[in-house]
Curated annotation (Swiss-Prot):
Gene that this polypeptide is encoded by: MEP3
Transmembrane annotation, as ranges: 18-38, 49-69, 109-129, 140-160, 174-194, 210-230, 240-260, 268-288, 290-310, 331-351, 373-393
Extracellular side: 1-17, 70-108, 161-173, 231-239, 289, 352-372
GO terms of molecular function: ammonium channel activity
Cytoplasmic side: 39-48, 130-139, 195-209, 261-267, 311-330, 394-489
Subcellular location: Membrane
Key words, A-Z: Ammonia transport, Membrane, Transmembrane, Transmembrane helix, Transport
Full protein name: Ammonium transporter MEP3
Residue spans of biased composition, Polar residues class: 448-481
Organism domain of life: Eukaryota
Family: Belongs to the ammonia transporter channel (TC 1.A.11.2) family.
Length: 489
């Protein structure tokens, strides 16, 4: 048929499956702003907006990379003789408009979109490594190269029919290796190359907005439910089971971390609660479609304990992993993959009606443990080495040095890299100190207003408050050497 004659699509698909996957892709994407709010709240105020920006921009980079050659490298159907990486047969989303296989009930295009959102989440997690000291443009260059050389090969290993891990029988339901461990190791290595933040700037450091941390965690949990459930690729019993497993693991993970923090601080920590929930969600990522419900209860407890203590690793290795990517994503991902070897059951895996697997130790498949461990080691090792090479090479190229200057770090990434601020009133207050205010003129204005107070007592009260605030601010300015220094600068 010639072009322009009118073409009617004759392929038929199951509408419920297509709708399920579209909804799943949308909710996985919704995790991206959740990560942005989480990271922003955990950082200091002067870099709050930069972390939201870098997470969103990481998603844009990921979408472009996936469209050009990412999907083809990760899921090529014609690279059956290559167990490491796909080819460019689907470059630019070519040949992805039919069924992904003869017996599939959905078009390959929706599968490509769904997997694209998974990579966007992985890149957004890594973006947190730039916290308070990383340049933004070089990080975007890093993410594009990283997605090509690291994410696509490891994803091909585990999810493409030609990958060695897929053929070996590794159990990784929704990305414990190619998303969680990969993003954690990459973020940790990137933090190493960035170097530590200035110690004098970390005195009395604490998250600037715990409410935003809580909001981000809630959004993540909401999106994570379909992140795991929709990995069944159809609305079946296995997706329902994965949904419940995700909730159980997050619940016990949050409770466990919170109790551990209370044991040492004798206070209930909201940040600790959110950290534990995230650890439980991460652990459920590779296991929620494979293990039993009571296994998820135990998994959340183990993840909460192990990840809580794993936050100390960065101090021993002297790496400024400011957002604890290694502990909360890497170690939790390892826990989930190990639990697949322990608690995976053949009857859980078979709930989708199509997948056959012997399960783990629970169903007497003893060799599953070394298969899982080998996959963990291969994913983490390959990611660490290639990420280090990418960071080293980029650091030698003029214009793409990874770290900002000391002055920019002290000023904050919002002002140095963005030019906008998460909280304008903070910058108005700073400008007030730098510009200075004529207090004599303000006193004259306020005294004139006082003479009219008999006719308008409300206005008198407001002017008095303004006068007090102004004088107080001037006194603070005159007694604070840091503000004098800022004005001179």
């Amino acid at each position: 048929m010639a072009r322009g004659d009118g073409h009617l699509w004759t392929e038929t698909y199951d509408s419920s499956t297509v709708a399920f996957m579209i909804l799943g892709a949308a909710l996985v994407f919704f995790m991206v702003p959740g990560l942005g709010f989480l990271y922003s709240g955990l950082a200091r105020r002067k870099s709050a907006l930069a972390l939201i920006w870098v997470v969103i921009m990481a998603t844009l980079v990921g979408i472009l990379q996936w469209y050009f050659w990412g999907y083809s490298l990760a899921f090529s159907k014609t690279a059956t003789n290559n167990k490491f990486i796909g080819n460019l047969d689907s470059f630019g989303f070519r040949n992805v408009y039919g069924k992904i296989s003869d017996d599939s009930t959905y078009p390959e295009l929706i599968y490509a979109i769904f997997q694209m959102m998974f990579m966007c989440v992985a890149l957004s997690i890594i973006a947190g490594a730039t916290a308070e000291r990383g340049k933004l443009f070089p990080h975007m260059v890093f993410l594009f190269v990283f997605a090509t050389l690291v994410y696509c090969p490891i994803t091909y290993w585990i999810w493409a029919p030609g990958g060695w891990a897929y053929q070996w029988g590794v159990l990784d339901w929704a990305g414990g290796g190619n998303i969680e461990i990969l993003s954690a190791v990459a973020g940790f290595v990137y933090s190493y190359f960035l170097g530590r933040r200035k110690e004098n700037l970390l005195i009395n450091f604490r998250p600037h907005n715990v409410s935003m941390v809580t909001l981000g965690t809630s959004i993540l949990w909401f999106g994570w439910l379909l992140f795991n459930a929709a990995s069944s690729l159809s609305p079946n019993m296995r997706s329902v089971y994965a949904f419940m497993n995700t909730c159980l693991s997050a619940t016990t993970g949050g409770m466990t971390w919170c109790l551990l923090d209370y044991r040492s601080e004798k206070k209930w920590s909201t940040v600790g609660l959110c950290s534990g929930i995230i650890c439980g969600l991460v652990a459920a990522t590779p296991s929620s479609g494979c293990i039993t419900l009571y296994g998820s209860l135990i998994q959340g407890i183990i993840a909460g304990v192990v990840c809580n203590f794993a936050t100390k690793i960065k101090y021993y290795l002297k790496v400024d992993d400011s957002l604890d990517l290694l502990a909360e994503h890497g170690i939790a991902g390892v826990v989930g993959l190990i639990f697949n070897a322990l608690f995976a059951a053949d009857w859980v895996i078979g709930m989708d009606g199509t997948t056959k697997h012997k399960g783990g130790w629970l169903t007497h498949n003893w060799k599953q443990m070394y298969i899982q461990i080998a996959y963990i080691g291969a994913s983490a090792g390959y990611c660490a080495v290639v990420t280090a090479i990418i960071c080293f090479v980029l650091g030698k190229i003029p214009g793409v040095h990874l770290r900002v200057t000391e002055e920019a770090e002290a000023l904050g990434l919002d002002e140095d890299q963005i030019g906008e601020f998460a909280y304008d009133y903070v910058e108005v207050r700073r400008d007030y100190y730098q510009w200075g205010v004529d207090t004599d003129a303000l006193h004259t204005t306020c005294n004139g207003a006082n003479s009219a107070s008999e006719t308008n007592p409300t206005e008198d009260s407001q002017n008095s408050s303004l006068s007090s605030a102004t004088v107080s601010g001037q006194n603070e300015k005159s007694n604070n050497p840091k503000l004098h220094h800022a004005k001179e600068a």
